[in-house]
Structures are given as C-alpha cells and as structure tokens.
Amino acid sequence: MTEIKFHRVLLKLSGEALAGPGGSGIDLTTVKRVANELAEIKRAYPQVQIAIVNGGGNLWRGEPAAKAGMDRARADYIGMLGTVMNALSLADALEQAGVVTRVLTAIEMRQIAEPYIRGRAIRHLEKGRIVIFGAGTGSPYFSTDTTAALRAAEINADAILMGKNGVDGVYDSDPRKNNEAIKFAELTYDEVLRKDLKVMDSTAGAMAKDTDMPLVVFNLNEAGNIQKAIEGQDIGTVIKGSK
C-alpha cells in the first residue's frame, strides 16, 4: 500500500466546487462524486482523519450583498447559513456512501448539527468519523478560508488541502484567461503575499503562516486528487511557512 504523508487533514472546499456545471446552487451529482471519493479514501486508509470546511459562495455571497446596501454583518450571517446547507448536503452523501459523519457548527443549531467544541471535534476524528465544520467562524467579516486556517490549527492538522474548481494549482495569473500563465510547484506564504497571488485572503494566509501549516492547492475536479494529495504525490502547488 502507498505510504501516506498526511494523517490528519483539513479539506477546504469552495461552495462553487459543490455547484457543478451550473456554477450555483447545490448539484447533488457533484456532491455525491466528492463524497464517494472521500469514502474510497476512508476505506483505503482508515487511519486517515479528515475534517472539512466548505464555503457557501454557490448559494450566497455576503460582500456583494453589503455593497448593494445590505448590513454587512447580516449578509455574512446569511452566508454562514449557506455553508451549513452545503455541509448537510455533503454529510448526507457521505452517510449514504457508508461514512459516519458529524456536522459541527460555529453557530448553535442543535436540531440539525452539533455545536463546535474543539475537543469533541478531535474525538470524532479519532473515532474515524469525517467532521464537517459549518457556519464559518461564527463571526461576520471572516471568510471560510480563514475558518479553514483556524480549524486546521485547532485540530492540529498536518495540512490544509484546498480543492479548486478546475484549477490545478497556483499560477502567476489566471490560467483560464492567460494561456502563458506560469504554475508554481512550491511557494512560501511570504512569496504568496509578495507576488499578490490570489490563493486565500490575507487573514487566512497570515494565520496559516503563523501556525506553519502546509497548504496543498489542487484541482478538485480530477478524480483521485484528494487521495493523491493525502499521499503527498506531486500534484498542484505546495505552500509552506518557509523553504
């Protein structure tokens, strides 16, 4: 069996990654595909512990709503509810694939999910359950990228795996718009900031750098890439605190 590099990971999924070809809403076929891939990983490597933070941009974006005149905090809270909708959809697909799953939310909604408690989250992971963190950090103005950096540090993850929608790593410009865009195999967080590469927002990047958390950016749309990232195969771009 292939050796694995990361034993406890935080998988960051954008909301758009669950939207499928339509680009918005929840595409159940796409959700099922992601869930089945995660289930295969758990069967192949039962010792691997997987936590997930998903975005909500397929359902709502707080910042544009605020620019349109809505109260920013309220707009962000709506976005947090969107992440819970995505989390519940993914949890259902995982359960149907035979994986025991727990959804923990930063805002209490006990009828549908457990409240986020760090020790409880770690205990679920140790028992082999996939843990999905919903509702962001529970506070407005913080992105789900920041949530991923925060939760990864809290659960002592070995790495953040950032699945991108159709982009296989970090480039010096948008490869979908520039055919001559150059892909980076490895970067430091300082280089990401200096080159103004749009990997994650500055708050998330600063937290990941401060906690020296490795980040693997890869194409989620290519089947098997989550497992390859866990195994440490040479896919995507690896970002570290230092060379």
Curated annotation (Swiss-Prot):
Keywords: Allosteric enzyme, ATP-binding, Cytoplasm, Kinase, Nucleotide-binding, Pyrimidine biosynthesis, Transferase. It catalyses: UMP + ATP = UDP + ADP. Allosterically activated by GTP. Inhibited by UTP. GO terms for cellular component: cytoplasm. ATP binds at K12, L13, S14, G15, G57, R61, N165, Y171, D174. SUPFAM superfamilies: Carbamate kinase-like. It is an enzyme of class 2 (transferase). GO terms for molecular function: ATP binding; UMP kinase activity. Residues 20-25 are annotated as: Involved in allosteric activation by GTP. GO terms for biological process: 'de novo' CTP biosynthetic process; UDP biosynthetic process. It is found in: Cytoplasm. Catalyzes the reversible phosphorylation of UMP to UDP. Homohexamer. This is Uridylate kinase. It comes from Oenococcus oeni (strain ATCC BAA-331 / PSU-1).
